[in-house]
Amino acid sequence: MLFSLINQNQDLLENLFEDFKTNSLTNNNNIMKTDIQEQDNQYFITIELPGFKKEDVKVALEEGYLVVEAKNSKKNQIKEANFIRKERFQGFLRRSFYLGDDFLLEDIKGSLEQGLLKLSVPKKEVKPKEKHYIKLN
C-alpha cells in the first residue's frame, strides 16, 4: 500500500515536470495569439496580452513592419518561491506584421483592455505600379 502510494506520487511528479518541459519548450506559439480582420477601409488587429499593462506594451512602425513589443515589468511579477507549476508568461515578447511603406504611425489607433490589444490600421489606396520598359535597339 505504502509502496503503491510512493509510486503514484513519483509518477505524478514525473508527469508534472515532463509536462512543464514540453509546454515551456514547444508552446510559445500560444503567446500573442492574433486575429486580423479586414473591412472595406481598415484592418483590425486583436492580440492577446493577458497580464500586461498599457505601460508594458509598445507599438511601432519599423521599415514597413508593425512591431508589437510587450515586457512584464517587475511590479507584475509574483515573488513567491514555492511554485509547483508556473504557466503565466513573464518576460519579453515581440511580434511583427508587414504592412508596407505607405503607412504612418499617426494613422494607427490602439487600446489595451482586459488583456486584448486592439489596433485599427486604415487601408491605403493601392496605386498601380508604373511599368517601365527597356528601349530595344
Curated annotation (Swiss-Prot):
Protein known as: Probable Hsp20 family chaperone
Keywords tagged on the record: Chaperone
Classification lineage: Bacteria, Bacillati, Mycoplasmatota, Mollicutes, Acholeplasmatales
Function statement: Probable chaperone.
Pfam family, one: HSP20
Highest taxon of the lineage: Bacteria
Keyword Chaperone recorded: yes
Keyword DNA repair belongs to the record: no
Species of the source: Onion yellows phytoplasma (strain OY-M)
Domain sHSP: 25-137
Family in the record: Belongs to the small heat shock protein (HSP20) family.
InterPro entries: A-crystallin/Hsp20_dom (IPR002068), HSP20-like_chaperone (IPR008978), Small_HSP (IPR031107)
